[in-house]
Amino acid sequence: MKILYSLRRFYHVETLFNGTFVLAGRDQETTGFAWWAGNARLINLSGKLLGAHVAHAGLIVFWAGAMNLFEVAHFVPEKPMYEQGLILLPHLATLGWGVGPGGEVLDTFPYFVSGVLHLISSAVLGFGGIYHALLGPETLEESFPFFGYVWKDRNKMTTILGIHLILLGLGAFLLVLKALYFGGVYDTWAPGGGDVRKITNLTLSPGVIFGYLLKSPFGGEGWIVSVDDLEDIIGGHVWLGSICVLGGIWHILTKPFAWARRAFVWSGEAYLSYSLAALSVFGFIACCFVWFNNTAYPSEFYGPTGPEASQAQAFTFLVRDQRLGANVGSAQGPTGLGKYLMRSPTGEVIFGGETMRFWDLRAPWLEPLRGPNGLDLSRLKKDIQPWQERRSAEYMTHAPLGSLNSVGGVATEINAVNYVSPRSWLATSHFVLGFFFFVGHLWHAGRARAAAAGFEKGIDRDLEPVLYMTPLN
């Protein structure tokens, strides 16, 4: 191997077993990275890096299309989606495609169309990825300067950031358009047990929208995860889309200020670390959203939330025992608290028993039975509808608890089914992904800062204290 200008630059690269394995411009000698370091070989080859990213997008979209069609092929209309291990169809159903009152699936054709569109798109992206990886120009700076870049060119980097923000903003507006003009979205709070409806009365008040960001993340507050009506969700997307588009235009038109130039490390690996940090935050927020929120993730499709299944059990047995003659207003439980009903710390009437800890649950099947001071005893005695009983009995036996081998539900529940809730899968997977992306952020941020500071080896081994100590032998 030729001696390179500085071996220190390549301290982190292992020697190849087969030194003859060469890809022009992508081998260890010219890039300092071996084949297994993947896209690190392409740091300075913008054309090839474009190919890698387009091909990666193709793989993602291919998975979406193939998995979509797989779920359509296995879908059984007689069973709820959450009993079939589906994670993609619930998202399409939430957008109002193919479903009617109560979340009943009326037509699976829109789901089929979605899968086919994603497959076709993935073929286009796959072709583009292969073209740019193998045939296209290695670098874009000469032939297509608009698409070329140098990592340390701060102005170009913020322009690229701006373009990304505009695309994200347009994505947020797509949901707004779907909800307002193209058939509406599924609203679990629609009267009578949920339905697809157009959103007409958007919440655009900044006090309401940004109030969510200022709420405590704990208990009944629940930060943005506590959002429980579609007007606020769609209105929030109007705000988010506008902020992203305006921020994108701002970043395209301006150069970074001096404080920003000083504060950030301006290198490819630094941008990777910033992106990983952002994705990590997204993952953790998505985890909490899918676990606790039954408006953006309707229980008709994703199954009940944990608190919802617990409250449903208390409600189901209250209904049963009330029919058998129990006085649910005054019956005492084994601890001396109310067996069926008790008071919360703030005085509302809530369900008694172990489910007391979930007293701030809000769910469409339960809210009609609340009055100004919590659960209304007279409504519980006279106004319970059959659909509320059916839904709570169903949710009681489908708690989002379960293990990887699909032994799901409450361990002591004799009526539970062999089932793992999509909420469990989606929340767990996004927590794990969020965690690993955070570790990736720390790793790449540390390397980027070290490179910027001019040392990549870590501590200088010449000054190791152990070198000055008496040998053990």
UniProtKB/Swiss-Prot annotation:
[CaMn4O5] cluster binds at E367. One of its GO terms (cellular component) is chloroplast thylakoid membrane. Residues 1-14 form a propeptide. The modification N-acetylthreonine is found at T15. SUPFAM superfamilies: Photosystem II antenna protein-like. Its main location: plastid. Keywords: Acetylation, Chlorophyll, Chloroplast, Chromophore, Manganese, Membrane, Metal-binding, Phosphoprotein, Photosynthesis, Photosystem II, Plastid, Thylakoid, Transmembrane, Transmembrane helix. Binds multiple chlorophylls and provides some of the ligands for the Ca-4Mn-5O cluster of the oxygen-evolving complex. It may also provide a ligand for a Cl- that is required for oxygen evolution. PSII binds additional chlorophylls, carotenoids and specific lipids. The modification Phosphothreonine is found at T15. Pfam families: PSII. One of its GO terms (molecular function) is electron transporter, transferring electrons within the cyclic electron transport pathway of photosynthesis activity. GO terms for biological process: photosynthetic electron transport in photosystem II. It is a multi-pass membrane protein. InterPro entries: PS_antenna-like (IPR000932), PS_II_antenna-like_sf (IPR036001), PSII_PsbC (IPR005869), PSII_PsbC_sf (IPR044900). It comes from the Eukaryota. It is found in: Plastid, Chloroplast thylakoid membrane. The chain crosses the membrane at residues 69-93, 134-155, 178-200, 255-275, 291-312, 447-471. One of the components of the core complex of photosystem II (PSII). It binds chlorophyll and helps catalyze the primary light-induced photochemical processes of PSII. PSII is a light-driven water:plastoquinone oxidoreductase, using light energy to abstract electrons from H(2)O, generating O(2) and a proton gradient subsequently used for ATP formation. PSII is composed of 1 copy each of membrane proteins PsbA, PsbB, PsbC, PsbD, PsbE, PsbF, PsbH, PsbI, PsbJ, PsbK, PsbL, PsbM, PsbT, PsbX, PsbY, PsbZ, Psb30/Ycf12, at least 3 peripheral proteins of the oxygen-evolving complex and a large number of cofactors. It forms dimeric complexes. Belongs to the PsbB/PsbC family. PsbC subfamily. This is Photosystem II CP43 reaction center protein. It comes from Saccharum hybrid.
